[in-house]
């Protein structure tokens, strides 16, 4: 339950995890991670699938690598669960994903009773999701603030449009500035919002989405 500080730099760097991936479980404690260099991972894997569980932790990440992922797998599928955890993530790079996979066949991201605050800039970046395949994102009793800025950047989903967002009783605030004119890369019928508070701003325009109220 102490504090861990890790800084990576170089061609390929992983702060917590390994190039070979596998199961990674982080429970309790504070983690301050600074990622720099050419290809970087804060928590996860470079070349294999990863199953990540972040539980009851306080995680602060500064991601400044040119390419890679902050939390997840660079080149394979990533299953990520974030529960009772606080994550603050600042990103600046060329091509990267904050939570998910960059070149894998998709990802699942399950956020429950957690707080996630992201401020991302880059040429091609994604807050939660993947460049390819299905990105299945679920939020329950979560508080998320996602600010994303860059030519080919967006907040949630999969770059090929096969993302899915299911949110229940969440407080979700999304602000995106890009040239894609997309904030969530998913079909609107695959965006399901139940209860909670939601705000979506794309290129200074407010986007209204249906929120189902169930009490």
Show where each model-derived region lies.
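Surface-exposed loop/turn motifs in large extracellular/passenger domains
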Residues: 1-36, 44-122, 128-150, 157-215
